[in-house]
Amino acid sequence: MTETEFNNILTNDIKKVEHNLLSFLPDCKDGQESVVQAMEYSLINGGKRLRPVFALEFANACGGSKEDALPLACAMEYIHTYSLIHDDLPCMDNDDLRRGKPSCHKAFGEDTALLAGDALLTHAFEIIAMSDLSDDKKVSASLLLAQNSGVGGMIGGQVIDLIYERQNPSIKQLLNVYKMKTGALISAACLMGCISAGANENQMACASKFAYSLGIAFQIQDDILDIIGDEKELGKPIGSDAQNDKTTYATLLGIDKAKADVEKLTQSAISQLDAFEKTEFLKELALKLVNRKK
């Protein structure tokens, strides 16, 4: 696949997602404008759109339609966006900026930001329920998304990560955090794409293995970039983990070992794609994500 072909597919996928994201927003009623505006503000605030792209591309890899997967892809991005709003709150990471713009609570106030996050979370499941997919697929997608974004996935990973900020976690414990915090939502995205296309059990299993291996590699690469990344390329200061005395994979094992494990995990992820058709784009995307500079 040429660079131009890859970029065309990625651009078209992102355009499809961004065109539909706002169309799923709830209608404003008297007095509710501020929370819907905060939802919209956060949804359109850039980002890689990584998770919805995975949903669309796994639907395609299973022989399904990207159009059928679009509601699930957008629901996935609603969940991801709510998590970012809550991450930025003063009680969590206390970040004033998100992708170079004021974070939601700085733009709309803490109370509205909290409610906007809650609204995005709950509305994600309404998007799935109102889609044209079969009832079985709606139930499967909703259950999967709830499990992977809840205590058994992203939320659980956040809780454990907070605990480890006051401790010195082992590599095994760190990998579990990465699996839950990052891998779980990537897995949900890939699997929801599979669900929309009616994937078989083997494809579901392979998609899950792909997502978790890539998710962990993605997080380790983040750790590496926080040590040796270029601040101009990243668009944020480096060294925040060290300043906060936070233990990461790269600080525990060193840069060279971390880089080697990113490569190993990425190749493990790519090997799972043998269960699918039309995987050239997914292979290239996996490589670009773990070799990124920002």
Q: Which stretches of residues belong to each language-model region?
A:
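N-terminal amphipathic/basic leader segments beginning at the initiator methionine
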Residues: M1-L25
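Mg2+-dependent prenyl diphosphate-binding active-site environment of isoprenoid biosynthetic enzymes
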Residues: K15-K16, L25, K29-Q272, E277-V290
